[in-house]
Amino acid sequence: MVTRERAENRDGPKMLKPLVEKRRRDRINRSLEELRLLLLERTRDQNLRNPKLEKAEILEFAVGYLRERSRVEPPGVPRSPGQDAEALASCYLSGFRECLLRLAAFAHDASPAARSQLFSALHGYRRPKPPRPEAVDPGLPAPRPPLDPASPILGPALHQRPPVHQGPPSPRLAWSPSHCSSRAGDSGAPAPLTGLLPPPPPPYRQDGAPKAPSLPPPAFWRPWP
């Protein structure tokens, strides 16, 4: 039993080593395939269309592409927003073009009319898009256009004035210390305040009903004294 267990333990690493090696090769192949597609989108080199391209050639293309990019754009130099926008637009067009090429390989079975309609609609997305308007903060009120005085809405409102009330002045507004002092200075005596202050309120009973003020008895005409 002990000899059998030792034999299985010795065969374990031998069985795992080929599996690990296979996984490592699969990872390398996947990364190289992705690198080939990325270089094809950026460089548009027809040699990169071959899916069976040698691994060494893919790596040489990658080194040449990085060397060219570092020569055009030195490291450490900040990029402007315009350059970033151009790079994004170029990336978008390259990827879209690659998708169209892949779609064309599957569109041969469709009818010519359907294929033409599909590609004409897809090619519309390759046109440059107009710049977007500036974003407006939804929390801020929308700007109002300036009003023209000659407009039919604003013109009559400017020329028409509200009617001025010609009634007697309010007692509170008519009486003021300066007004009383000016009147007293003109006549030499203090001006009476009759008519300038509001009349006192009528007396109220305890039950809440107002008490009528006492009036003198009515005068009757008599022929005798």
From Swiss-Prot:
UniProt motif WRPW motif: location: 221-224
Subcellular location(s) per record: Nucleus
Variant or mutagenesis effect after changing K55R: Loss of repressor activity
Biased composition (Pro residues): 140-149, 213-225
GO MF: DNA-binding transcription repressor activity, RNA polymerase II-specific; protein dimerization activity; RNA polymerase II transcription regulatory region sequence-specific DNA binding
Induction profile: By Notch-signaling.
Signal peptide feature range: none
Record-level GO cellular component terms: nucleoplasm
Alphabetical keyword list: Developmental protein, DNA-binding, Nucleus, Repressor, Transcription, Transcription regulation
Domain bHLH positions: 12-69
Effect of K211R: No loss of repressor activity
SMART domains: HLH
Location, primary (coarse class): nucleus
PANTHER family on file: BASIC HELIX-LOOP-HELIX TRANSCRIPTION FACTOR, HES-RELATED (PTHR10985)
Subunit description: Transcription repression requires formation of a complex with a corepressor protein of the Groucho/TLE family.
Chain's role: Transcriptional repressor. Represses transcription from both N box- and E box-containing promoters. May with HES1, cooperatively regulate somite formation in the presomitic mesoderm (PSM). May function as a segmentation clock, which is essential for coordinated somite segmentation.
Identification of the protein by name: Transcription factor HES-7
Species: Mus musculus (Mouse)
